[in-house]
Amino acid sequence: MEKGKEYLMTGLLLVACLAAPQAYVVEGSGIRECLLYHFTHENVFHLILNFMFLLRYKPLWRSTLFGWITASIAAYMPICAMDLPTCGLSGICYAMIARSNAYQKRISWIAVLSNIPMALVGVFNWRLHLMSYLISFISWTVYLRVRNS
């Protein structure tokens, strides 16, 4: 694959993060916030951490689009609501990891168990990360089984 194509989605996500209106997910958030919160970051460090993953992962458009949809659905679920506002690309990143894991027919226990320290700290929306991962993994597993049968 060409180098330019490998980094295209990462570049487009960076532009979206810089250009999109500020949006946060809190309890009772509407569809608009659930669709846009991914592009808001708490600070530059938060943005850099997400993009370090993306630069390594080099997502393609299908992974990115499905990750965005999956993380947006997870954000709309009441179980993922927190008192603190949620923002960032992490839900999309977890959904993209799940897509790769579904193709490999295995669960990434590192991705799943990484939520334990986040739950203990209390300022990270670990439920959103976990739901994004699970929804994406289950969806892709079902899709792949239907496609291959």
What residue ranges belong to the model's regions?
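A detector for small-residue-rich transmembrane helices and their helix-helix packing motifs
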Residues: 1-149
